[in-house]
Swiss-Prot record:
InterPro entries: HD, Hesx1, Homeobox_CS, Homeodomain-like_sf. Interacts (via N-terminus) with zyx. Residues 109-168 bind DNA. Belongs to the ANF homeobox family. Pfam families: Homeodomain. The keyword Nucleus applies. GO terms for cellular component: nucleus. One of its GO terms (molecular function) is DNA binding. This is Homeobox expressed in ES cells 1. PANTHER family: HOMEOBOX EXPRESSED IN ES CELLS 1.
């Protein structure tokens, strides 16, 4: 073997392990040799029940779960004619249930719409006529008077400004449309 090749092979032998910033490490390609020697890590997944055999002999089943409220599966309900619900109490303790409930809040969807009363809307509209961009102090004062959360009042003003902008745009469009149609008729 030539001296250059010997030197190169010694460098390869003395090479340090790849850094954690290498492409192989980031992609997980360097883990292939480590997987066989490392113990199997079992992740905490309280939403998984082990009651149906998978391809590799493990038992996995991911149920539809609801902590307190029933989950309605509309496609199944049409075919089965009933609501489908599974309770989390059957598979988890109280602490796991609360953690899971917080993690699944995205699944349940948005918060319910705030139903404003007629008097609340009148007061909000009066304030909007005077100031369409109320500060935090005015919003908090309104929240106290109207028994609403400040963030709901902030959203109401955002929606009201969007509605005003939309109606202004539509009125501009109608004015242009009317002027064009009158010119065409002449």
């Amino acid at each position: 073997m030539s001296p250059g090749l010997q030197k190169g092979s010694r460098l390869m032998e003395n090479r340090s392990p790849p850094s954690s910033f290498s492409i192989e490490h980031i992609l997980g390609l360097d883990k292939k040799t480590e997987v066989a020697s490392s113990p199997i890590i079992k992740h905490h997944r309280p939403w998984i029940q082990c009651n149906s055999e998978g391809v590799d002999g493990t038992f996995w089943h991911i149920p539809v779960i609801s902590c307190d409220l029933p989950v309605q599966v509309h496609a199944l309900r049409r075919s089965m004619g009933e609501e489908t619900q599974v309770r989390l109490e059957k598979c988890c303790g109280e602490e796991d249930r609360l953690t899971y409930k917080r993690e699944l809040s995205w699944y349940r969807g948005r918060r319910p719409r705030t139903a404003f009363t007629r008097s609340q809307i009148e007061i909000l509209e009066n304030v909007f006529r005077v100031n369409s961009y109320p500060g935090i102090d005015i919003r908090e004062e309104l929240a106290g008077k109207l028994a609403l959360d400040e963030d709901r009042i902030q959203i109401w003003f955002q929606n009201r400004r969007a509605k005003l902008k939309r109606s202004h745009r539509e009125s501009q469009f109608l004015m242009v449309k009317d002027s064009l149609s009158s010119k065409i008729q002449e």
